């Protein structure tokens, strides 16, 4: 299948079968999911009942959800984002969920009119597709006022965040989540607290710290983001090597390595510089693809961008980017390189910019940096 995660083996204790009369306990497995596989082969993640309850309560508290709220769910329910943020958190609050058959930009505004929701949650690529059709649906937006919008599962460009707030007249709350955390780890707060574009916000459930990228201890400054809390999976299914590399104990506390590089500011807001495996190493110079994304997104003709590594004979890796332009744009690769050169040091400027009608995405709507060079024939 096009989006197959591969074949996996699940293991159970056949000597202690569970009978239908037994009710699940907090430590029983509730869900068996797999990671999105953005940087490696997907891994099986068992999620406990206690993980779901903890995460749903965290999200309910962050978003101040009540029984008056209606969430319009456009996220797939085979993945943690929709299952926990849209459905489980709403149920925990006693609210309502209006389920669509799946995301469709052409039907989104009709659904918005039918559902009259107070909020919805989506990945950045969905938000960008919604913005592309927003102007022609201005009347629907005006008569269906949202309390807030939410974005998670990938970095939301600050330009897109500001445009969503302008178009919908509501705050856009960016959260930081992953399957192993039963979704949410951090979240920008609702007003009147400050939202910081480019940041994934404050701790919103588990403890979040910064760890040394290769040694098992916590540090100050920039490093690997790690988490600890009751929402964290007990470990990957039948994968001793991944568990050894992803979990460690420091001063009596168990920490999970997210694989993301980041740092806190003075106010406790967390900013990510990218997946560690996606950081571009250009002859020893480490380049965050998110930083390059942010610069290119300032170009008025660019509506979507993803920066990634391409092989280089002498440097090991070099910088490349794929972009989608506004309809009718005549901007060239040379124009975009010149734009980037005026705003970045030379070694960060993409040496190749590919203009596409659509950037390849994974099954959950995430842009895929790893493997994109090969997909586009740049290897």
In which residue ranges do the predicted regions lie?
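Conserved ANL (AMP-binding/adenylate-forming) active-site segment centered on the GW(Y/F)…HTG consensus within
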Residues: 169, 193, 232-259, 276, ...
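Conserved pre-ATP/AMP-binding loop-to-beta segment of ANL
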Residues: 15-34, 41, 64-70
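Conserved ATP/PPi-binding loop(s) of AMP-dependent carboxylate-activating enzymes
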Residues: 202-205, 215-247, 287
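Conserved beta-loop-beta connector loops within the AMP-binding
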Residues: 176, 196, 209-227, 266-267, ...
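Gly/Ser/Thr-rich phosphate-binding loop
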Residues: 117-122, 131-195, 207-209, 214-215
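Conserved AMP-binding/adenylation subdomain of ANL enzymes
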Residues: 53-70, 80-118, 129, 133-136
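AMP-binding/adenylate-forming catalytic core of the ANL superfamily
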Residues: 120, 229, 234-235, 261-348, ...
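Conserved AMP-binding A3 loop
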Residues: 30-54
């Amino acid at each position: 299948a096009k989006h197959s995660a591969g074949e996996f083996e699940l293991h159970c204790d056949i000597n202690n079968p569970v009978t239908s009369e037994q009710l699940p306990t907090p430590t029983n497995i509730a869900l068996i999911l797999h990671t999105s596989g953005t940087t490696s082969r997907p891994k099986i993640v068992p999620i406990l009942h206690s993980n779901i309850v903890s995460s749903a309560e965290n999200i309910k508290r962050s978003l101040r959800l009540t029984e008056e709220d209606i969430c319009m769910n456009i996220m797939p329910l085979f993945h943690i984002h929709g299952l926990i943020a849209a459905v489980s958190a709403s149920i925990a609050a006693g609210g309502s969920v209006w389920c669509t058959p799946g995301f469709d930009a052409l039907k989104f505004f009709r659904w918005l009119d039918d559902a009259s929701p107070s909020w919805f949650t989506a990945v950045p690529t969905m938000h960008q597709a919604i913005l592309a059709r927003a102007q022609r649906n201005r009347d629907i937006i005006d008569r269906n006022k949202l309390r807030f919008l939410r974005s998670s599962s990938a970095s939301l460009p600050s330009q897109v965040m500001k445009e969503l707030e302008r178009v919908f007249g509501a705050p856009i709350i960016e959260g930081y989540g992953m399957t192993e955390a039963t979704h949410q780890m951090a979240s920008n707060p609702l007003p009147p607290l400050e939202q910081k574009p480019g940041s994934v916000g404050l701790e919103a459930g588990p403890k979040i710290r910064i760890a040394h990228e290769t040694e098992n201890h916590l540090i100050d400054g920039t490093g690997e983001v790690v988490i600890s809390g009751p929402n964290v999976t007990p470990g990957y299914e039948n994968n001793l090597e991944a568990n050894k590399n992803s979990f460690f104990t420091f001063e009596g506390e168990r920490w999970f390595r997210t694989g993301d590089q980041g740092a806190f500011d003075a106010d406790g807001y967390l900013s990510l510089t990218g997946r560690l495996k996606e950081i571009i190493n250009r002859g020893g110079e480490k380049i965050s693809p998110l930083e390059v994304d942010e610069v290119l997104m300032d170009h008025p003709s660019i509506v979507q961008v993803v920066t990634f590594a391409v092989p280089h004979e002498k440097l090991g890796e070099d910088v490349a980017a794929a972009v989608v332009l506004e309809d009718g744009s005549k901007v060239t690769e040379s124009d975009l390189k010149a734009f980037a050169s005026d705003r970045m040091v030379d070694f960060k400027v993409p040496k190749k910019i590919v203009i596409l009608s659509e950037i390849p995405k994974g099954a959950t709507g995430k842009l895929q940096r790893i493997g994109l060079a090969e997909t586009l024939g740049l290897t």
